[in-house]
Amino acid sequence: INFCNPWSKNGSSHKHRLTYPRQLINYREFLKDGGEIYFKTDDDDLFRDSLEYFPASGYDIEWMTFDLHENEPEWNIRTEHEGMFTEMGIKIKALIARKDPDPASVTWIEPKILKRQAREAAEAEAAAKAAQEGEGNE
């Protein structure tokens, strides 16, 4: 994944990121166990967030750097965007993430599911409290 749109975290636009957990979990469907994703970006926020996204989506971060060109690996192929950002003095961040074959390694839960679970727990607690108060009035 090279220099994808960082989709700032304003509103819900970050959900469109190619490294957002929903996307990374989808990639697990066709990526072989132990398969790798190489990710490069110039965007600091996207990279920092992705450092959390990958493990929550069932990937082990095997290698990472906040300055790819400081000790550039032999495998790196510089893209046009990479060259442009480097000339501007922007450091290129990169990582290699490996798919963990264990489905239990996916710990991410969709935010709307978390909200629903919290709402249901609050409703159950309120119902239990009301039932308890009703028993005390008898």
List each model region and its residues.
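A structural signal for short, well-ordered beta-strand segments and their strand-loop junctions
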Residues: 38-40, 62-63
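A short SAM/SAH-binding and catalytic strip from SAM-dependent methyltransferases
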Residues: 1-18
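SAM/dcSAM-binding transferase cores
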Residues: 61-138
